[in-house]
Amino acid sequence: MIRECDPNLDIAMTTNGSLLSKYADELAKSGLNRVTVSIDAIDDQLIREISNSNVSSKKIIDGIIAAQNAGLKIKINTVIIKHFNEDQIIPLVELFYRMRVVVRFIEYMDVGGTQNWNANQVVFGDEIREIIEQAFGRLTPVN
């Protein structure tokens, strides 16, 4: 329906990925071009704590694979929280590098006071970059 308004329109969505394996083909056939999946950990316990749900990393990753197979462009958004999921940076980079999926690390920020945000929990972009570069060497920009 949206695609009919403009055949060149870039249609995207952001999701936690929990239903993506079920709907990726249908979404692609409906005209979706790309999807951003929010995943803040590979560790299932951390995912449960962050999302307050029982979604597993396997379910999310299976959804990402289904989206790839459906021809959708994919990006990953990951929020890193100091002393909580910092240890997930390298496993996330390794996994999505192997899958050829771009990961964007996003600084933890106040979203209206709904998550008991604390400035001391912020891991800044340069800190994340340093952790990654210590493990893999100098990073280069991706367009």
Language-model features: locations:
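Auxiliary Fe-S-binding modules of radical SAM enzymes
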Residues: E94, R98, M109-N143
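Radical SAM/AdoMet-radical enzyme domain recognition
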Residues: M1-V102
